[in-house]
């Protein structure tokens, strides 16, 4: 390994220009200089971690206007230790028994359905029973002496006070003495007051390595001191189910330094700078006939960034937004951005396709590189997308499927019920669920898609391979869960006489 700017390339890993946002999978953010310097200085000495946590907690309270603060192991780690605090109350005899909550007075967490998400594994890991509710009335009816906590994600509407808002939930919960944890992981930080604490939340959790640009492995908890002292007790270096959520002295100091820096950053000027990046890109690519651009300014706190949408007719350019995003992310210099026209990937309109550029994690000079790359990519001559070849086989029927995961073999089943020329429909039975299966056959090349969907979880299956008579084989892409291999054998039904 080489140290310095080429550290990643020396390992055979090509860095990316981040035009997508604070996604952990691409590194989320870069440290503010103050955090970088603070972490370097922190690593030079030893310190007693409980004493450090008290000093950091007090200073975070001074900076934020909250009663107390804790640096956690990421936002998810913060959610976990806050849940542990809610069920233990700071009682170490309870702490060391988690996740076995037998004998605990409180073992339930209420979550509004719209707040159920993959990150609530951090809460489920504690062993609590999750109570999912759809309305404010259901939430209030679900509150009982066994309710340890309510977890929620805030509304994206500024100032929302309607049903299931932070304000409405906190008001109802306060009457029953139930703490409310707000997950504000990707939000811009608000201080003196924090908007969610001002709305009545007990604790608010942030990711340290997103908008705040602190250590990527750190999180930030602000709120009620008693609950947060129990949360700190639940985390490393203290033993128990939170021992794996370690926060080192460097992360503690780096996170505090990032919050200190946040109070001094010129946020309005930063947004003007980010908009300037997008204007540079927009001016360059809009010179191409048939390409349109629009810049959207942020209105809320979540993922607060100006965004540029670049749209075109896929029939004229022979490329979809996903084609363009894939090309830009897999060729040098690599650029990570989003496909689709609107927020969260929504298409711009029926006849347009697009890519979106988020500006807030771009670095000086990135705008010119990105402008040239997108201009050149859109200017390339591409052959028209060819018509699909005639299918080489009739795939209707049942298929026994063997999937080879990294360290396990699993048996699944395809039931292909319809084959309309190149288009296929049916079902995919996995080890745990049965799901819709859709796909295509192009000559002997097959692509199937299904998803094992559960409340707050989704395991995607994209099968791609080839068919040869009554057998199929190829690879499976599972999104964030990486890849596996599959083989399938058609079940030949005996002919009736």
Label the predicted regions:
Residues 42-50:
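N-terminal alpha-helical segment of soluble enzymes
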Residues 49-54, 68-69, 242-246, 265-275, ...:
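Flexible, glycine/charged-enriched surface loops at secondary-structure junctions
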